């Protein structure tokens, strides 16, 4: 119509405003470029592809805060959970921002978190060679990464949050240690409390000093629980791992690294994470996108028999006996008086000495959590028969077992010290062959 000019500008503005309100995720981004910054005041976040994870600032109020003031952190959480927010990573867990002025930006090929006075409180501190510009990305699996502009390998990063776990292990993360270079050890450390993300009392760490590797749950520096060694399928001391049908477990043990990792198979609607809780339990927590309520799939320590060295040397724990601690056949309580008073931590001693020769025999114990492996040696080339012969010839040998239970069993684990921290299961576990004096094998 002549004389009427359609106001397309206002129409488009209104249209995009409506879209932004109704579908805010359409405009979300997972990248941070060198000319951008995330600030507390802007309330902007990075959202991973698939809308599962979100990175941004969050605050907590703790009793330890001066005057109960808020503390601010840069972290990653599940965007898909309703109600209580579930955090999976915190950058500055032990160096909080003490007011609502904080900035995350890229500076000199590193991510830097600045406080109100532009003082760095956290940084990736990248020291290698980078092709500028670099970008930061929150990936679909929850990994926050820094990469340079010339990298064509999508799995190669200058820095990644997966190398610096907090209290949570996500699918595709690794827990363990690199054996080359000066890369950090990857462990889980609990929050100090449910509302304080600073480092707590409990940690979950892979022991890599011996021939076999197993995880320990520590309270400060004291061992609370041991998983048992990896047996080719699962950790020997966690029989329930065989029931984790939707989890693919893997253990890497080579010249470059020793680490555990897992992935969720088949059903991508399932979210699973391992969490070292502030109360001292390693938890496997799972939920689905359709039912966001979190379920505790598994938690340890589960019972008294899970506690580290609860029965002492040459004794095993069994939840189906009373008392729960039992001396191995051919052994007697080291201190009978304390044993009768249910103080069994001293363990047991041999009732008959070994002859160190063919006069000794072996007691087969089924469905066992294998003893602590710090005093064990490994020979991957031989089987159970050769392992027995080797143990017979070694007067220091106290027991042996298969290293790997796959395909009927292979490899040899041989203990040369006290057998400690054992338990018997109703199902699962492994066969353990304990060297005993011939007299101990005679039926009573």
Curated annotation (Swiss-Prot):
Pfam families: B_lectin, PAN_2, S_locus_glycop. Gene3D superfamilies: Bulb-type lectin domain, Hepatocyte Growth Factor. Disulfide bonds join 387-412, 395-397. GO terms for biological process: rejection of self pollen. InterPro entries: Bulb-type_lectin_dom, Bulb-type_lectin_dom_sf, Pan_app, S_locus_glycoprot_dom, SLSG/EP1. Residues 1-28 form the signal peptide. Keywords: Disulfide bond, Glycoprotein, Self-incompatibility, Signal. The keyword Signal applies. Glycans are attached at residues 43, 125, 243, 396. Residues 356-437 form the PAN domain. Residues 31-159 form the Bulb-type lectin domain. Stigma. Involved in sporophytic self-incompatibility system (the inability of flowering plants to achieve self-fertilization). This is S-locus-specific glycoprotein. The lineage of its organism: Eukaryota, Viridiplantae, Streptophyta, Embryophyta, Tracheophyta. The gene is SLSG.
